[in-house]
């Protein structure tokens, strides 16, 4: 593939990742669809998969940048001292650890079958629709009950509930953000607190998993120059776009419902299904 075209495609996918990673519309699902649309392929084994993990790291670094003050405080005050939602840095990260457990277990058990059977544009579109309907139902049933509950503390039970809901994100098209926010609603948290806890939860989950997968695949050293350039470009683009999106998303959540994202999911999914039936995928 021509180097310039390869880099241009990586820019588009970096934008897609940066926009969708923290919105409740499924970044993995969008990447699967756009990779198929653009024919994003490579002669190098596992390159496309590695590219996905690298741009996810770019998106997660946006969280680190935007929440660096809170992260630094929770690390420095690992023992007593009121930080973020918790009264101690230790408790805060312990809640994150608890929330990670269900997802890690499910990932180990179901990663292979999910990758084998659910990584197609049509299956993603179906899940986008089902997830959108679920979001509308969950918001109507749970969100309004928690509008005034701006809790500054996440309990072990709440963390475990959020972690359990995060397990659904293993299904391409479901969305980790949507799953954890709905889990936060069910646990009794406000939308903003649930979303910010979701951002912090993404740091160990996505950062750790992406790094492990990059190492497992074989690292970056054996890739041709064009592919290395595209990785760097995709990482930077995803980082910059995610920084802008996260700030706007939190501001949006304070004023408006998630229903608009649910409607977008369903409209986009219908377009994908029509394209699939017409033979574009």
From Swiss-Prot:
A Pfam family of this chain: BacA
GO CC annotations, alphabetized: plasma membrane
Catalyzed reactions: di-trans,octa-cis-undecaprenyl diphosphate + H2O = di-trans,octa-cis-undecaprenyl phosphate + phosphate + H(+)
Keywords: Antibiotic resistance, Cell membrane, Cell shape, Cell wall biogenesis/degradation, Hydrolase, Membrane, Peptidoglycan synthesis, Transmembrane, Transmembrane helix
Top-level division of the source organism's lineage: Bacteria
Sequence intervals crossing the membrane: 5-25, 48-68, 92-112, 118-138, 154-174, 192-212, 226-246, 261-281
EC number(s) reported in the record: 3.6.1.27
GO biological process, alphabetically ordered: cell wall organization; peptidoglycan biosynthetic process; regulation of cell shape; response to antibiotic
Compartment(s) of residence: Cell membrane
PANTHER family: UNDECAPRENYL-DIPHOSPHATASE
HAMAP family, per the entry: Undec_diphosphatase (MF_01006)
Remarks, miscellaneous: Bacitracin is thought to be involved in the inhibition of peptidoglycan synthesis by sequestering undecaprenyl diphosphate, thereby reducing the pool of lipid carrier available.
Role, per record: Catalyzes the dephosphorylation of undecaprenyl diphosphate (UPP). Confers resistance to bacitracin.
Name of this chain's protein: Undecaprenyl-diphosphatase
């Amino acid at each position: 593939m021509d180097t310039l075209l390869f880099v241009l495609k990586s820019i588009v996918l970096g934008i897609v990742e940066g926009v969708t990673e923290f919105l409740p519309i499924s970044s993995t699902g969008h990447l699967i669809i756009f990779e198929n649309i653009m024919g994003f392929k490579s002669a190098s084994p596992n390159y496309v998969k590695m590219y996905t993990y690298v741009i996810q790291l770019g998106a997660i670094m946006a969280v680190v940048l935007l929440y660096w003050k809170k992260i630094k405080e929770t690390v420095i005050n690992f023992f007593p001292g009121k930080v973020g939602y918790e009264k101690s840095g230790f408790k805060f990260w312990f809640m994150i650890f608890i929330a990670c457990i269900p997802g890690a277990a499910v990932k180990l058990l179901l990663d292979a079958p999910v990758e084998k059977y659910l990584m197609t544009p049509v299956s993603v579109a179906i899940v986008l629709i089902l997830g959108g309907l679920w979001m509308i139902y969950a918001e109507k049933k749970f969100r309004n009950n928690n509008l005034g509950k701006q809790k500054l503390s996440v309990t072990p039970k709440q963390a475990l509930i959020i972690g359990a809901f995060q397990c659904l994100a293993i299904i391409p098209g479901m969305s980790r953000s949507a799953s954890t926010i709905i889990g936060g609603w069910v646990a009794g948290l406000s939308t903003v607190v649930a979303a910010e806890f979701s951002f912090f939860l993404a740091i160990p989950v996505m950062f750790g998993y992406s790094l492990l997968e990059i190492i497992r695949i074989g690292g970056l050293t054996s890739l041709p120059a064009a592919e290395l350039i595209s990785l760097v470009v995709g990482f930077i683009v995803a980082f910059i776009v995610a920084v802008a999106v996260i700030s706007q998303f939190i501001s949006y959540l304070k004023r408006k419902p998630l229903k608009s994202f649910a409607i977008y999911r369903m409209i986009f999914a219908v377009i994908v299904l029509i394209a699939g039936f017409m033979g574009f995928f």
